[in-house]
Amino acid sequence: MNIKTIKKIILPLFFLIIAIIFTNAGNSYSGTKKIITLKDALTLAVKLYPGILTSKYSYLSSVYTKNETLSQYYPQVSATAGYSKNSFMNVDNNIVTSNGRIITEPGINYSLNDYSASLNATYMLYSFGSRYYNYLNAKYQMKGANAGYNYAVNSDLYNVILNFAEYFADKELMKADKENIKNDEIQYKAAEAFYKVGTGDLLDAETAKATMETAKAAYINSIFSVRIARLALLNSIGLPPSKNYVFVNTLRFKPFKSKLKGLIKSAVKNNPQLKQALYAVKAAKASVKQSVSGYYPTFNANFSYTGENSAFPLNRNYSAGLSVSIPIFNGFLTKNKIDYSKAALNSSIWNKKLTESNLIYGVSSDYYALNNQYLTVKALKSSEKASKLAYTLAFKSYEVGVGSMVQLVTANAQYISALTSYINGRYTYFYLKAKLYSDLGLIPEHYLK
């Protein structure tokens, strides 16, 4: 075998090996799993969820709007420069001789350059509050937008917690359905065995089989419920529907020990919706005062420098002075602005009262619902243990020929029902707790710190 033949064989094999290595490396990289706890999910949502980012940039735009109003506190300076060339064509060219005769020569053409420059400055000296209340209005609107951003964070993070709890609830319910199938299969095999040896009847075997098939259908449904819940969780975080994310259940069932009075006080202080309503009232008050200032004059200082000539240096002129602008009549515009601002203020005041009342009611309801759910879950846990024991006893009784298939099926159904209720109750407690912290406006403080 010569060298050329060896090269023809070895080189393709070499490139094939390289391709396989890179392919495996790519598959290994793409298959890397990212572990996500509840805290991780919430942190990612703050960075990725479109609803939160929308509110964030809406708040930032209000910051720049507020900064725009500060421009009235600075001189407004502008400068212009110009150049033009004027041409004159076929201008009469008459010449007077010494003896008084006028001789007309052919017309002449000529042009003149025109240079100009100007610098103008205006500064508002006093405006009877118009400038200040315009700034104050924008400032409170900015603070309201910040509260709106915090409200979006609390609301969207609550949805993440809700979807997180529902996902793991559905996973546990799927396990319960799988256990139900296992129990039903054992029951069916036992009933069929008794029937074959003549100690049982066909009805028991068929009843057990029908129960088993129903359990299989429920299990299939629970599998897809888990998949849908996972998609909902990923969407609420702002992540794509990828299999590379592995969620880890970090929820812990603990009693809630805070007192209602302290919770209401905390909610009134921290709830972003109430803050938003409060800043809306303050902004509306500033708007009323700004509208009233429309009846008063404004004082300005003016300065200008101009230069103009057909050649350099330019002929320069300076001008400086004070001016006052006095409103006399504007078609009742100022009056209508005041009436509108006062109506908007009253609307904001009543909206604040409504928001505060709803907040106190909501926090109180959350508090009682959470405590009720905690006690309910403890009772459901006891029920689940008792029903599991009852099923075990019923199965043993059936095995020795004392119990009936009806008792066994009933006991298993009661056990699975109790287990399902316990799972649902426990995860309901988790998102009721999140709902309370959302109304308090403290989800980031409680879950992310």
Predicted segments, located by residue:
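Periplasmic alpha-helical coiled-coil/stalk elements that build and connect Gram-negative outer-membrane
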Residues: M1-K8, I36, D40, S155-S266, ...
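Bacterial N-terminal signal peptides
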Residues: P12-T23
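Sec-dependent signal peptide cleavage junction
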Residues: N24-T43, K47, S58, Y447
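Acidic, low-complexity, intrinsically disordered peripheral segments
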Residues: Y29-G31, L38, S87, P241, ...
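Amphipathic alpha-helical coiled-coil scaffold segments and their short linker/junction regions
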Residues: L42-L48, S98-R101, L239-A301, H446-K449
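Small/polar (Gly/Ser/Thr/Ala-rich) solvent-exposed segments
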Residues: L53, Q76-N94, P106-L112, T122-Y151, ...
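Amphipathic alpha-helical coiled-coil segments
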Residues: T54-T69, A152, D156-K178, I186, ...
